[in-house]
Amino acid sequence: MHGLSIHLSVAMKILLIIGDGMADRPLKELGGLTPLEAANACSMDRLASMGVSGLFNALGSGVAPGSDVACLSILGYDPYKVYTGRGGFEAAGADINMKDGDLAFRCNFATVNDDMTIIDVRAGRIGEEAVKLAESLQNLRLKNFDVEVVFRHTLGHKGAMVLRGCGLSPKVDIQPPRAYYRADSFKPLDGSAEARKTVEVLREFLRASYNILKDHPINRDRAAKGLPPANAV
């Protein structure tokens, strides 16, 4: 915060609460107010009245950063220097111990058709069923690459994946999942053999995980109930 200096005792404990996305936007249903403006937030108002308020721009004025970048900045890191993507945070949160050379990804369980076109980017916001689906991927092996796949469920439709092996590169363009886009539209960001290999590894993982998930009993049951199957990662 510009112009604000707070001196804390070394022994002082701090509880940092980040209302990630809480500000939201004005809604017609709320008479042009944001959910926070319309809420009965007397406890928050009291805390604010007892403390000091300020304005903090994580990446500069007018820039709305993602959660990961914003939290890095709040904790005192320069995202422009240290940010490498969200996957590493997700892997750490899933208790995956990463090694040098590993690639980490934040993943969604999704619904695709047989040509890998995305139908639902969150598989109907699947919940605890995703735990069993993630377990079914624990023994997944890639036929054409000596690359280990570590996959863990994290929360709801979300998961974390780590690829471990030689000759992998982070220089791969992975677009955020969108409905009616192809799930396998990965592209190398440079002409290196490592980037091209990583693209092919990701495509093989996508197809291999689809082959496991599409016939999983949970997905057969979901389809029978008219729910979107979580048949892809």
Question: How would you describe each model-predicted region?
Answer:
Residues 9-11, 146, 215-217:
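Short hydrophobic "helix-edge" motifs at membrane interfaces and signal-peptide entry regions
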Residues 13-15, 54, 105, 157-159, ...:
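Structural beta-strand/beta-sheet cores of well-ordered domains, especially the beta-sheet scaffolds
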Residues 13-25, 46-47, 205, 221-224, ...:
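Beta-strand elements within well-structured catalytic alpha/beta cores of enzymes
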Residues 86-213:
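A contiguous, mid-domain pocket- or channel-lining segment that forms the substrate-recognition surface
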Residues 200, 210, 214-221, 225-228, ...:
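Long, well-ordered, tryptophan-enriched scaffold segments
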